[in-house]
A protein has these predicted regions:
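Conserved alpha-helix/loop element of class I SAM-dependent methyltransferases that forms part
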Residues: 108-121
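Serine/threonine-rich low-complexity intrinsically disordered regions
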Residues: 8, 13, 53, 111-113
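Non-catalytic substrate-recognition/targeting regions of SAM-dependent transferases
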Residues: 18-35, 39-105
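Short, Gly/Pro- and small/polar-rich lid/capping loops
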Residues: 2-21
């Protein structure tokens, strides 16, 4: 019997972010705001051209660079960044910090799951 549960799937979009924003994406990178800091991180799915000008991207506080198809790389900071800082999502407080694997301590796209879990508890 064929499983057709995907036809009844729901798609959720995060709407409760105060401290995260996907600002722009393109050329295999994304420009994101985490609290008051703006970062450039690699993203292989960002294959289009960025919407914003290169000048705008140059305002980033830091950038992660890595070898092609590698998650590990290095951060280069253009402005002073603390070791970690607080990010708010709805009623949650999250510690954000740059990791050697391009992440900043959490995955913003998973926030709909956090909200779903919170609503169940």
């Amino acid at each position: 019997m064929e499983n057709t549960n995907f036809l009844n799937s729901k798609i959720f979009f995060p709407t409760d972010w105060q401290d995260y924003e996907l600002i722009d994406f393109g050329n295999n990178k994304k420009l994101e705001r985490f609290g008051k800091y703006i970062f450039i991180r690699p993203d292989n799915q960002a294959i289009c051209e960025p919407y914003l000008s290169r000048k705008f991207w140059k305002n980033a506080d830091g950038e992660f660079s890595s070898e092609i198809n590698s998650d590990k790389g290095n951060w280069k900071f253009y402005n002073q960044i603390p070791e970690f800082w607080d990010i708010k999502y709805n009623t949650l407080n999250i510690k954000s910090l740059p990791t050697p694997f391009r992440h900043l301590g959490f995955f913003p796209e998973q926030s709909v799951h956090w909200k779903w879990c919170r609503d169940l508890i």
